[in-house]
Amino acid sequence: MNDIFGNNNGYRVPKLPFFYYIRNIMDIQLKQGCKYALLVPTSMGLRVTPESGQPIHSSDILHLQATSAETNVASISSYLGLPVKVLTTFVEGSPFAAFIKSNLRARGMDFEGADVPQGGPWGYRHQINVADSGYGSRGPRVWNDRAGEVGRTLNAKDFDLDRIFGKEGVQIVHLSGLIGALSPDTTKFCLDIARAAKKYGTRISFDLNYRASFWKGREQELHDAFSEICSIADILIGNEEDFQLCLGIEGPEAGGKDIASKINGFKDMIGRVKAQYPNAQVYATTLRQVNNTNSHNWGAIMLEGENWHVVELREIHVLDRIGGGDGFVGGLLYAILKGWEPEKWIQFGWASGALATTFLTDYAQPADEEQVWSIWAGNARVKR
């Protein structure tokens, strides 16, 4: 296994040993004596994709995957050997719950969560994400089917947060705005986790991940909750739409062309975020300009302390774009956990995001660090 210091002992899937160390990374001091490098709360679901990039309505062969944005992020660390834990909930006795648990084990992740009784055929279930990856001039389409989603019941009372953060220990907890906005219960769940993390010295990463349908009718409530999390977060991530619609912070027009010419506008936006939420040590956003479904220009901006780091937009070839942003966050967090210099945080994040778009799953499955760095270097030569 790869231990926390990156030594390879012949196995990919970690057995989650305790490790004892402390690192000062610029202003980010990671907690010592922790069992887990990374913790992610999430609502696990199913991703259904047609074969060969075909549209749903014309397909009769569908592939089933286990999915969530938060485990997409955590997969970079787990595949590269760091100990990861997932907090979630399952439908009791469901074959899909068994499928999800098997997938998390295969990714090298510990998981913990209640098995909730289904309550009959019209009761709880795991959410379904139907994804048409698109091709060429035909753009991707995603259909979310979340009726009866068991993850909406996530509640801090189902977990011993004092044990998880105090006795076991966690270096970084990654929170997503998807879970934060999923239901009133999950909003409180994320707040409780953030407060417990702060109490025990765990660093907090927060990706705003705005979804209009989740926010409808709850705008003020969610703005207040997200603002509290942002006020104690150590790492803040979001795109121009996230910062504007979640926090009311002005930024560049969402989407559009010629993103490269707007980099100063993105920097100004991040500066306003920092002024409003000065506790964080790292602020990051990705840049994406879509040429066609299979060709994107991909970049990133990061502010750590007073230092700007910019990855200028570069063309990447895309098999499936879903999960690229999660891959960026996962690579960024992995680089921070490894104690690398800040310049490498954004580089590894950019390359991990690019790697994720080459997989049919919506999460990257890096073979090793070298594979990720080869993407950064633009080297796609055969490795023998």
Question: Where in the sequence are the language-model features?
Answer:
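Positively charged, low-complexity intrinsically disordered leader regions
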Residues: 24-55
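Short catalytic helix/loop segments, enriched in acidic residues and glycine
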Residues: 55-75
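Alpha-helix C-terminal capping segments
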Residues: 65, 73-85, 106, 335-338
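Conserved N-terminal subdomain of the carbohydrate kinase-like
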Residues: 83-177, 372-384
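Conserved phosphate/ATP/ADP-binding segment of small-molecule kinases
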Residues: 214-306
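Conserved post-catalytic alpha-helical subdomain immediately downstream of the catalytic base
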Residues: 293, 309-378, 382
